[in-house]
Amino acid sequence: MKFPIKTIRRGGQITAFPKNSLEVSKLVKFSNKYKFHILPIGGETNRVDGTKPQFEKTILIDFKKMNRIEEVDTDNFIITAQSGTLLKTIQKAANNKKLLFPVNIAPSDKCTIGGNISTNVGGLQTLRYGNIEDHINGLEVVLSDGTILNFLNKLKKDNFGPKLWKLFCGSELSLIHI
């Protein structure tokens, strides 16, 4: 069985380190074909045995290498970042451009934006600024069949129908991989 990207194997468990959505898609398709369970790993700050595999044939998808800020658009006040990017890195990128990313939780140097989105984190200033979903303009997601959906949008004001990507905020990755 040839694996689609670089991995570490331990018994029946495989840890994979994708670098982009296409590699996540390949992992999901691979896991479907060979009947592996998937366990996504972000910053591991919400440790309640969530990253402990419960099944023998498990692929742990570690998002640590998906840690790039792809763009800081100061005209539209939008930061595009991969899911493994640390919250602190996003806050620094915003501050460097004289912008504010108001989501602020204690382990900002360890938690990832993908994990924050999957739990719809609020943080210390939630009453003033809202939860993280209030600061997201779009997402690129990988569905459970490996399909990549791109909901990225640079329009600040968008009245085009319901925001389907909002379904994924707070889903705890039960629906997709961010």
For the regions a language model picked out, list residue spans one by one.
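FAD-binding subdomain of flavoenzyme oxidoreductases
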Residues: 68-72, 78-176
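Ser/Thr-glycine-rich phosphate-binding loops at phosphate-binding pockets of nucleotides
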Residues: 42-46, 86, 177-178
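Charged, low-complexity, helix-prone segments enriched in Lys/Glu/Asp/Gln
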Residues: 1-3, 141
